[in-house]
A protein has these predicted regions:
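Helical cap/lid subdomain of alpha/beta-hydrolase-fold lipid enzymes
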Residues: 1-169
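Short, surface-exposed loop/turn motifs at beta-strand boundaries within globular domains
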Residues: 25, 179-183
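Extracellular beta-sheet/turn segments enriched in Thr/Pro/Gly and aliphatic residues
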Residues: 160-179, 260-300
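A short, amphipathic beta-strand motif
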Residues: 184-192
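Short, ordered, surface-exposed loop/turn motifs in non-cytosolic proteins
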Residues: 194-213
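Tryptophan-paired
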Residues: 211-254
Length: 300
């Protein structure tokens, strides 16, 4: 239960990390993860083993320690519904995070640890990149060196994700094309005015004209509700589609994405003498920027 997305313990740990500010002296975390799916390990009963934006087990956005916290509160003065406004935006400490090429979570062929061998193989270049990335982490001795490595890892990750976006798989009878987009993870926790959990509610994302119908097609990859903390929802969003993607000839047309993002919360009961009012956060470009972070998780 602890590791389930949106668990109370996981939220507390992540919020504490985000609020921690500067790291202790001479402690520099590093994150290395692949985003390659080992098709031989795909489980037809568990589609998450082939989930985009992951290594087949862990999402890049989950592994990435670069995370943010956003709190919303009711804006005073509204009668028909509670207009929400941003109360707090906190970005966690900057962490060096690198997506390495051709690596999955496990397995002797593509596993990020098990597949690295001393002898030369067909994927020796990917092995060398993985080992070199680890050695570059070991060589860090100062804050300036760490900051430079953070910037280098960011640039290398961006280049790699562009390079690995389209995968032509020879493992199927007919040619199969997989598109590996970048993803963002947003974990929503809903409370009432007394900080009590809400278990019966609807949460809608909105775009221009404050409508959920103006969001781009295919923007939502996955949505999960925590089994124990029923007031917590995790949205897994396609960052490329949300921000606008370029054409992939023969695979996908160009789409403009959205320039604004907002949300609505409809809690139950919403009728009767004692009831909840709807809560709405007006869609805006600033909310889109705050909630949609490439390869990252945002707690809201």
């Amino acid at each position: 239960d602890w590791l389930e997305l949106g668990s109370e313990a996981l939220w507390a740990m992540n919020e504490a990390w985000i609020r921690s500010g500067a790291r202790p002296p001479r402690l520099w975390p590093f994150v290395l993860i692949g985003q390659t799916i080992d098709r031989k390990l795909y489980d037809n009963l568990n589609t998450y083993t082939g989930e985009d934006g992951s290594d087949g087990v862990v999402r890049v956005a989950s592994a990435n320690l670069n995370a943010s916290y956003v709190s919303l509160k009711p804006k005073p003065g509204s009668r028909r519904f509670d207009a929400l406004e941003v109360n707090e935006v906190i970005s966690g400490p900057k962490v060096a995070m690198r997506v390495v090429p051709g690596r999955a979570h496990a397995g002797k062929d593509l596993g990020i640890m098990r597949s690295v061998r001393s002898r030369r193989t067909n994927d020796s270049v990917d092995n060398e990149i993985t080992v070199n990335a680890i050695m570059r982490c070991f060589l860090v001795r100062t804050r300036n060196q760490y900051n430079r490595l953070c910037a280098a890892f960011d640039a290398e990750t961006e280049a790699l994700q562009s390079q690995e976006q389209v995968e032509e798989s020879p493992r199927f009878i007919s040619r199969r094309t997989f598109v590996h987009d970048i993803y963002s993870q947003v974990i929503f926790r809903v409370r009432d005015s007394q900080q009590c959990e809400l278990n019966d509610f609807e949460l809608l994302l909105t775009a221009k004209r404050a409508s959920p119908n103006t969001l781009p097609v295919g923007f939502l990859k996955d949505r999960q509700r925590n089994r124990l903390q029923r007031s917590t929802l995790t949205y897994y969003l396609n960052h490329n589609i949300m921000t606008g993607n370029t054409e992939i000839p023969g695979v996908r047309e160009k789409s403009p994405g959205c320039i604004q993002l907002g949300l609505e919360v409809h809690a139950k009961p919403n009728r009767g003498l004692v009831r909840f009012k709807d809560a709405k956060l007006q869609a805006s470009a600033s909310i889109l920027k705050a909630l949609l972070r490439a390869n990252e998780t945002v707690l809201v």
